Amino acid sequence: MDDTLIYRKIEMEELKLELFRKFQRRQNVDRQLQKQGDAWVEQPVSLVEEWSKEDYEFLLTCLQDTIREGGVVFGAFEGNAVKGFASVSGNPLGYAGTYRDLTSLHVSRDMRGRGIGTRLFHLAAGWALAMGGQKLYIAANPAIESQLFDRALGCTDAQEPDEEHMKNAPKDRQLEYVL
């Protein structure tokens, strides 16, 4: 665990590009889990996931919408720069509304491996439980590192896969975490 960071809610007025000036969203992906029939199979790939200024602007819009619609955004701060963040939608998912959607969870490249993602995940899960959720819904990036992270936390395949998530990101693995 990295105890030098401050973990707290991010308020609407803080959501500006400047907040992410020291955030490094880059991931070199050499292996992914891909759905083949009923099984998830590890496949070699070669790609780099990195955000542009336009990607950050889109992210800000999404995070602002999350707060506006009753959700929450948590951040891990080094000084006044965010080094990790997680967001949860305020809108219930699932047939009975038992899911709360973990809409983002990212840690800056220079800060990975320090327990920041785990701490943000648990903050998000605690909030989801307090809001009446029974499960956290995760549309997991297919990169093997992301999949291993989610599995280590206890996430399992979602019992009620969300159609919109599957349509928007067909390679993502639909997971849940029981609160």
Question: What residues fall within each predicted segment?
Answer:
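Conserved catalytic-core motifs of GNAT/GCN5-like acyltransferases
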Residues: 137, 156-173
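Acetyl-CoA-dependent GNAT
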Residues: 22-98, 103, 108, 178
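Short glycine/proline-centered loop/turn elements that form peptide/ligand docking sites
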Residues: 117, 121, 143-146, 163-170
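DNA-contacting interfaces and partner/effector-binding or oligomerization modules
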Residues: 2-21, 25-30
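Conserved GNAT acetyl-CoA-binding A-motif
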Residues: 128-141
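Conserved active-site tyrosine of GNAT-family acetyltransferases
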Residues: 149-151, 155
